Amino acid sequence: MKNLIKILSAIILLLFIAHPIKAEVISDDSARMLTFQPKISDNIRFAKKKLVMSRVLNRYDSPLLRSVDSFLSTCVLYELDCYLLPSIAGLESTFGKQVLYGSNNPFGWGNGLILFESWDQAIDTVGKGLKENYINKGAESVEQIGSIYATSKTWSSRITYFMNVFEKEEEKIDLILEQNQVNL
């Protein structure tokens, strides 16, 4: 009985304290049809780039496939286009398949004669070198980098070709994501 009196007292008290509100304001916002469009955060963007790199490197049967995380962390650290380094490796060594044995140098860095302990060390060293010796000195485009990096006049157009391979793969993934958009 005491519990019943306490419950009734609480209900009566709440009824007197409660403030009236306009239900149409609340229902107006809650009744709208929402389209779920996630804000592309850095994590999502880099997860997509990781997938793109993995798919392209897998297609070329590249030994660099296990170094996708190094490509990504290097592009973030040195503020590079994430597809630049793998594209250079694509041109210079067919994505790491044609290198001096044991050199771990897929970029042709130092005319391909510089030896690295690992692919990851090569990726970081070349990324840092591009940032410090090319980009920080005014070479901002692939063409400007190419005029310093390589003696071939077609180097930049061939790097651009490989960068486009990665970008087209990213477009395919974007299409898949758009087709699977959720409407609430």
Task: Show where each model-derived region lies.
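Hydrophobic, well-ordered secondary-structure segments
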Residues: 2, 17-20, 54-77
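Peptidoglycan-targeting cell-wall enzymes and recognition modules
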Residues: 37, 41-57, 87-139
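An acidic, Gly/Ser/Thr/Pro-rich helix-cap/linker signature
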Residues: 19-49, 167
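Secretory-pathway/luminal and periplasmic proteins that interact with or process carbohydrate-rich
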Residues: 81-83, 94-101, 150-158
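Non-catalytic cell-wall polysaccharide-engagement segments
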Residues: 2-28, 112-184
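Short, functionally critical alpha-helical segments immediately adjacent to catalytic or ligand/cofactor-binding
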Residues: 69-94
